[in-house]
From Swiss-Prot:
Source species: Mycobacterium tuberculosis (strain ATCC 25618 / H37Rv)
Cofactor note: Binds 1 Mg(2+) ion per subunit. Binds 2 Zn(2+) ions per subunit.
Name of the protein in question: DNA-directed RNA polymerase subunit beta'
Binding site for Zn(2+) 2: 891, 968, 975, 978
Residues holding Mg(2+): 535, 537, 539
EC number(s) recorded for this UniProt protein: 2.7.7.6
Cofactor(s) demanded: Mg(2+); Zn(2+)
Binding-site residues, Zn(2+) 1: 60, 62, 75, 78
InterPro entries on file: DNA-dir_RpoC_beta_prime (IPR045867), DNA-dir_RpoC_beta_prime_bact (IPR012754), RNA_pol_asu (IPR000722), RNA_pol_N (IPR006592), RNA_pol_Rpb1_1 (IPR007080), RNA_pol_Rpb1_3 (IPR007066), RNA_pol_Rpb1_3_sf (IPR042102), RNA_pol_Rpb1_4 (IPR007083)
Reaction catalysis annotation: RNA(n) + a ribonucleoside 5'-triphosphate = RNA(n+1) + diphosphate
Top-level taxon in the UniProt lineage: Bacteria
SUPFAM superfamilies: beta and beta-prime subunits of DNA dependent RNA-polymerase (SSF64484)
Enzyme class: transferase
Pfam families per UniProt: RNA_pol_Rpb1_1 (PF04997), RNA_pol_Rpb1_2 (PF00623), RNA_pol_Rpb1_3 (PF04983), RNA_pol_Rpb1_4 (PF05000), RNA_pol_Rpb1_5 (PF04998)
Length: 1316
């Protein structure tokens, strides 16, 4: 077998009949499979041992040779080679066809490659191949030309003969008629009888004329067809063809079926054809030129690849190895077999019958029919159902052909090559493990024992608990006591991987150190649930065991959960306290006025109370019960750093040192909370709402090493659970309080609603206005009930505590429980003007319940659809970006993009940009950031973290130029500096990081949270697409629904207002041609934007617009933005539009992820004029390749090619990738492979997918070339030492090792039998 690590490209091409015969180990002559009595393969059949190898190791068919020592011998009785049975997985056979057949992929694909090559319409091609028409394969022009006059004379003679015969017959008939009439007249017959005779005579004469005319027409037809006869001409009329062959057989050859196609291809001159097509393209116009372009693609493919087009017509069909189309015996003596065997059987049967018919010399019509059936059976074998009705098996199920084995989710690519099942894995239900550290998980004992079995067995033998592996295995199976001790030892420091399906982003698989636990459930740390999206309502997780040292190192260093605290999408921590923990910390840090032991200042004769000399003293007081943790106290602190303001005031420039004392007015709870934070973190003296907790952890992640952050969140988790228990927050029916003012509020609004209803009945309002008014009224009512509810609830109400702390839920839910449900939507997404006035606490009426179900059901249906759609989007994103890998440190480009940091308010203050988190944060600065005085605040090449951004804002800088992947100059992949900081580590991205896949996951993972619906904006008007469909529309570069025109030029607007349409004309400032936008529907409203005078209003007559400005409401078409404003603008447009959808759902994704995808969409250039290059006009070329080729051509003094950037949707971009393996495993497998084979494509194996498919290490991380191809150089001392070793003769090593390949030596290939 090939070792995958020793080749670095993979080529696909057309196999000729010669290739097929060379691969083959013998011809399959019989359709038999196995003998049903002996169950041994039949000789020369589809499972024949002579061809494919023995069915049992080292045993021939007849049993003469058994044992390894006969290795390689071919038995003289049965002809079977003595070898391993596994050769039946790799040895191929073939079927010699009695007549050639065409390959259905090349004939039936769209476009038909055979049709383009031979310039035949697919319909005609089908007629020829399936024996419905003859085709002329060659004409002897010269001979025909030389003898034309002779032939014409012969033809004239023949026609003369026909005419003479006709005239003679007419003459005779006329005379007979005369005689008959004369006779009748003599007899004195009536006029009636005479007329009948005359009519009869004339009818016969007409028939004679017609017959002669038909004969003449036929001769004319034959002659004209013959004189115009040319190769590739179709003749559908069988009789005409027969006549031509009889008369002029020596001047031309013609045939039917694949043989004729084969002849045409043989006579086909590729170079001449390519030249003439190029000529047409240079000088032609319109349809002709287009057709020539399409044909040239196919012709040039054959010309450049050196493929022989003969490969499209097969003389022999390969038979794949039998183990890949097995036959298994079921219980009950029946057999189950692969569909391929059926398809092969049909081919062999028909082929054998055809051979017999040809040998018998059967009539042509029978032979042709058999050839047609053979062609159809080969078609079914290659791609069943591509043409006509598919061949069906039992139960009318279409049989799976060779193409179906590759296609789709169940095909070879996606089922076996890209996703495999692995051993050393298990799965179980998860339960919470609050006692675990962040990097630990609880593994059930039994599962651990099974997973680590080989390790345990080896260790048992090492420790002499067992004599050999076999007895060790027995000990493990019987679970002896020693086994558990050994298991503890083996499991230590050996991380395991936990995975929860669906794995939407890379944090869906993380490594943990296992702790053995009783029971059968896996225990999971509560803080990693967010990343896995896990909860404990019955979720299951899978465990995998990394075996090799490298795998363990990777798991420990890169995948350990404590190293994955930050989200790769936004760079913000994911391991945050949630739910109970938030409640506990919120409770702990609340200050309750007037609680036990509160600080009282000195008054009169009372000294001050509630003052403590240290936290320890306060804790003693709390333990005695004289102080509550939530009471305000004064305490002297020495180990906690004071807040920044206090530190500056008390300790001045020198700053606080551990041990310096200061007094804090706070609560004991807050002191306890601050003791959880790392030493030297400023004291936080406020109530810990979830947002505050998040901000603190965020800050820790920016300033402290990951390990500190991990320890801190663990401490917070423990304290959170402890105090959540102590707080006694529970929910009961008694906690849901209905506000007493609810009835009067609703009565008041009911009156207002009645007024509107009356106006409607009087006709003062139309239906829509009434609905809008009612919706407004009831929205106000709902809000007011909410207000009343809030005032009515006491602060210590548990429901309010849970909502206020940010643990879970929101106020709307509280309002629904205790206030009123409010307005609900109908299935169309519009508000129903009758509100639900009851709360869930009171219970709904039947009508309210009914209208409430609409929304609930729609929600569930949406969720199901969304999951599938979102998964498919992620798959396409991964596919388009999988080869974007960080390839170098810095591409040295000067380009970048400008991002806003802040906006200057009219009063001169800076308003921080709300999206700074996803735009400027974590980027590399492209130019020095300079303030107004000219001081450099942040230098070029600096990473912009939170401190740097704060410094820039403090210096009054509003925008900076940053490096971006959109402007990166690296040819394949991107460079680290343009990408900037890796969101997941908080440091500059490593070389070898697969940033494309991270980007795809970051965009796809929140996809399930996006909405499915298209919003109705304000009732009427075009629907604005939103949510997931909008993201797909953008990434697929489709023309959006409700497309808005954009200004092609800068100028003044003339707006003409028609009855149903607007007409907008722009008069350019530079005096160019006016641009007219006609028939713009009024349903699309005019766009509101800022005008030169600073006002915001609708576009109106006489306004001045900038180039690229949107004129109507709706979405601009990205292709137009590209045409009008160029690639830069369309990139920014796409990033902005995608972000808008995610921001609407409150999802934070960094711009750089979207930029990676957008970069892939704009990678290609379409060739307009090929100049002196080899590019074909209209083809899509990678920009880097285009520029390189142009440089080369210009250097040689040629004419460069002209191209135009194109925006491709992600599906199209994935299929247009240079890697045919990656494209084939994505979609349209047969089309991609057909194309790749014709072009003799090479896959350079640059991306990830290709390497996964062939089983190489992926070129990312340490698999990238600069890490893989490291040569170790010995030091001088080592060199000197090397020469002191006595040299051995080479032959010691040569027989077994030779030039080492670096591959492991498979021991079972060495026959040890000789030494026994």
């Amino acid at each position: 077998m090939l070792d995958v690590n020793f080749f670095d490209e993979l080529r696909i091409g057309l196999a000729t009949a010669e290739d097929i015969r060379q691969w083959s180990y013998g011809e399959v002559k019989k359709p038999e499979t196995i003998n049903y009595r002996t169950l041994k393969p039949e000789k020369d059949g589809l499972f024949c041992e002579k061809i494919f190898g023995p069915t049992r190791d080292w045993e021939c068919y007849c049993g003469k040779y058994k044992r390894v020592r006969f290795k390689g011998i071919i038995c003289e009785r049965c002809g079977v080679e003595v070898t391993r049975a596994k050769v039946r997985r790799e040895r191929m056979g073939h079927i010699e066809l009695a007549a050639p057949v065409t390959h259905i992929w090349y004939f039936k694909g769209v476009p038909s490659r055979l049709g383009y090559l031979l310039d035949l319409a697919p319909k005609d091609l089908e007629k020829i191949i399936y024996f419905a028409a003859y085709v002329i394969t060659s004409v002897d022009e010269e001979m025909r030309h030389n003898e034309l006059s002779t032939l014409e004379a012969e033809m004239a003679v023949e026609r003369k003969a026909v005419e003479d015969q006709r005239d003679g017959e007419l003459e005779a008939r006329a005379q007979k008629l005369e005689a008959d009439l004369a006779e009748l007249e003599a007899e004195g017959a009536k006029a009636d009888a005479r007329r009948k005779v005359r009519d009869g005579g004339e009818r016969e004469m007409r028939q004679i004329r017609d017959r002669a005319q038909r004969e003449l027409d036929r001769l004319e037809d034959i002659w004209s067809t013959f004189t115009k006869l040319a190769p590739k001409q179709l003749i559908v009329d069988e009789n005409l063809y027969r006549e031509l062959v009889d008369r002029y057989g020596e001047y031309f050859t013609g045939a039917m079926g694949a043989e004729s196609i084969q002849k045409l291809i043989e006579n086909f001159d590729i170079d001449a054809e390519a030249e003439s097509l190029r000529d047409v393209i240079r000088n032609g116009k319109g349809q002709k030129k287009l057709r020539a372009l399409k044909r040239l693609k196919v012709v040039a493919a054959f010309q450049q690849s050196g493929n022989s087009p003969m490969g499209m017509v097969l003389d022999a069909v390969p038979v794949i190895p039998p183990e890949l189309r097995p036959m298994v015996q079921l219980d009950g003596g029946r057999f189950a077999t692969s569909d391929l065997n059926d398809l092969y059987r049909r081919v062999i049967n028909r082929n054998n019958r055809l051979k017999r018919l040809i040998d018998l010399g059967a009539p042509e019509i029978i032979v042709n029919n058999e050839k047609r059936m053979l062609q159809e059976s080969v078609d079914a074998l290659f791609d069943n159902g591509r043409r006509g009705r598919p061949v069906t098996g039992p139960g009318n199920r279409p049989l799976k052909s060779l193409s179906d084995l590759l296609k789709g989710k169940q095909g070879r690519f996606r089922q076996n090559l890209l996703g495999k099942r692995v051993d050393y894995s298990g799965r179980s239900v998860i339960v919470v493990g609050p006692q675990l550290k962040l990097h630990q998980c609880g593994l059930p004992k039994l599962m651990a024992l099974e997973l680590f079995k080989p390790f345990v067995m080896k260790r048992l033998v090492d420790l002499n608990h067992a004599q050999n592996i076999k007895s060790a295995k027995r000990m493990v199976e019987r679970q002896r006591p020693q086994v558990w001790d050994v298991l503890e030892e083996v499991i230590a420091e050996h991380p395991v991987l936990l995975n929860r399906a669906p794995t939407l982003h890379r944090l869906g698989i993380q490594a943990f150190e296992p702790m053995l636990v009783e029971g059968k459930a896996i225990q999971l740390h509560p803080l990693v649930c967010e990343a896995f999206n896990a909860d404990f309502d019955g979720d299951q997780m899978a465990v995998h065991l990394p075996l090799s040292a490298e795998a363990q190192a990777e798991a420990r260093i890169l995948m350990l959960s404590s190293n994955n605290i930050l989200s790769p999408a936004s760079g913000r921590p994911l391991a945050m306290p949630r739910l109970d923990m938030v409640t506990g910390l919120y409770y702990l840090t609340t200050e309750v006025p007037g609680d036990t032991g509160e600080y009282q200042p000195a008054s009169g004769d009372h000294p001050e109370t509630g003052v403590y000399s240290s936290p320890a003293e306060a804790i003693m007081a709390a333990d005695r019960g004289v102080l509550s943790v939530r009471a305000k106290i004064k305490v002297r602190l020495t180990q906690l750093r004071p807040p920044v303001e206090i530190e500056a005031e008390l300790f001045g420039h020198s700053g606080w040192q551990p041990g310096d004392a200061w007094m804090a007015e706070t609560t004991l709870g807050r002191v306890m909370f601050n003791e959880l934070l790392p030493l030297g973190y400023p004291f936080v003296n406020k109530q810990m709402h979830k947002k505050v907790q998040a901000a603190i952890i965020n800050d820790l992640a920016e300033r402290y090493p990951m390990i500190v952050v991990a320890q801190t969140v663990d401490k917070l988790k423990d304290a959170g659970f402890y105090w959540a228990t102590r707080s006694g927050v529970t929910v009961s029916m008694a906690d849901v309080l209905v506000p007493p003012r609810k009835k009067e509020i609703l009565d008041h609004y009911e009156e207002r609603a009645d007024k509107v209803e009356k106006q409607f009945q009087r006709g003062a309002l139309n239906h829509d206005e009434r609905n809008e008014a009612l919706v407004e009224i009831w929205k106000e009512a709902t809000d007011e009930v909410g207000q009343a509810l809030r005032e009515h609830y006491p602060d210590d109400n548990p429901i309010i505590t849970i909502v206020d702390s940010g643990a879970t839920g929101n106020f709307t839910q509280t309002r629904t429980l205790a206030g009123m449900k409010g307005l609900v939507t109908n299935p169309k997404g519009e508000f129903i003007p009758r509100p639900v006035k009851s709360s869930f606490r009171e219970g709904l009426t039947v009508l309210e319940y009914f209208i409430n179900t609409h929304g609930a059901r729609k929600g569930l249906a949406d969720t199901a659809l969304r999951t599938a759609d979102s998964g498919y989007l992620t798959r396409r994103l991964v596919d388009v970006s999988q080869d974007v890998i960080v390839r170098e440190h810095d591409c040295q480009t000067e380009r970048g993009i400008v991002v806003e940091l802040a906006e200057r308010a009219p009063d001169g203050t800076l308003i921080r940009d709300p999206y700074i988190e996803t735009s400027a944060y974590a980027r590399t600065l492209g130019t020095d950031a300079v303030d107004e005085a000219g001081n450099v605040i942040v230098e070029r090449g600096q990473d912009l973290g939170d401190p740097e951004i704060d410094a820039l804002l403090a210096a009054g800088i509003t925008q900076v130029k940053v490096r971006s992947v959109l402007t990166c100059a690296t040819s394949t992949g991107v460079c680290a500096t343009c990408y900037g900081r890796s969101m997941a580590t908080g440091k500059l991205v490593d070389i070898g990081e697969a940033v494309g896949i991270v980007a795809a996951q970051s965009i796809g993972e929140p996809g399930t949270q996006l909405t499915m619906r298209t919003f109705h904006q304000g009732g009427v008007g075009e629907d604005i697409t939103g949510g997931l469909p909008r993201v797909q529309e953008l990434f697929e570069a489709r023309v959006p629904r409700g497309k808005a025109p954009i200004a092609d030029v800068t100028g003044r607007v003339r707006l003409e207002d028609g009855e149903r349409f607007y007409k907008i004309t722009i008069v350019p400032d530079d005096g160019g041609e006016e641009v007219v936008y006609d028939k713009i529907s009024k349903r699309q409203r005019l766009r509101v934007f800022k005008h030169e005078d600073g006002s915001e209003r609708v576009l109106s007559d006489g306004d001045h617009v900038e180039v690229g400005q949107q004129l109507m409401e709706g979405s601009a078409d990205p292709h137009e933005v590209l045409r009008v404003q160029g690639p830069r603008e369309v990139q920014i447009h796409l990033v902005r539009e995608v972000q808008e959808v995610y921001r609407a759902q409150g999802v934070s994704i960094h711009d750089k992820h979207i930029e990676v995808i957008v970069r892939q969409m704009l990678r290609r250039v379409t060739i307009i004029d090929s100049g002196s290059t080899e590019f074909l006009p209209g083809s899509l070329i990678d920009r880097a390749e285009f520029e390189a080729e142009n440089r080369r051509v210009v250097a040689e003094g040629g004419e460069p090619a002209a191209g135009r950037p194109v925006l491709m949707g992600i599906t199209k971009a994935s299929l247009a990738t240079d890697s045919w393996l990656s494209a084939a495993s994505f979609q349209e497998t047969t089309r991609v492979l057909t194309d790749a084979a014709i072009n003799c494509r090479s896959d350079k194996l640059n991306g990830l997918k290709e390497n996964v498919i062939i089983g190489k290490l992926i070129p990312a991380g340490t698999g990238i070339n600069r890490y893989r191809n490291i040569a170790v150089q010995p030091t001088e001392e080592a060199r000197a030492a090397a020469y002191t070793i006595p040299s051995y003769e080479d032959q010691y090593y040569s027989p077994d090792f030779g030039a080492a390949t670096g591959a492991a030596v498979p021991l079972d290939d060495y026959g040890y039998s000789d030494y026994r």
